Amino acid sequence: MKTSILVLAGAALVGIIGAALHISARDGATWSRGRALYDANCAACHGGNLEGQPNWQSPGADGQLPAPPHDATGHTWHHSDADLIAYITLGGAEALAQMGVTYDSGMPGYGNQLNAEEIADILDYIKSRWPERERRYQAERTASDGGQ
């Protein structure tokens, strides 16, 4: 009986370790894709370290706000996944218009350049850079917004 318990415990441990390695490999691949896509499509405005543009909370001469940071000092983590996906896909002005807000945002839409999986990879990369508190808050916002 002791042998059976040890065999079952060993099998369970191997399964858990295997699942953890699979998840880590998947997350590592997602992170790498997300980082590469962020660098190619977002970093020029939002910064290579997610730092955003200087004075991002004050409109420029054109009336538009500079690109905000996507790190914990910004407000990206205040929004649900659905809102972030809409903003990236449609662009700022159109996404805001669909929420009933009129604002000439400088954020272009990437729906014609990036597919849904690529946008998700970018968001996963951005989220991976946040402290636990911000990730938890954003996950709660997403859950309260229907899980998207």
Residues covered by each model-derived region:
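Electrostatic cytochrome c docking/interface patches
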Residues: V14-Y38, R136-Q148
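Periplasmic/extracellular electron-transfer cofactor-ligation site
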Residues: A29-T30, R35-P66, L90-V101, S128-Y137
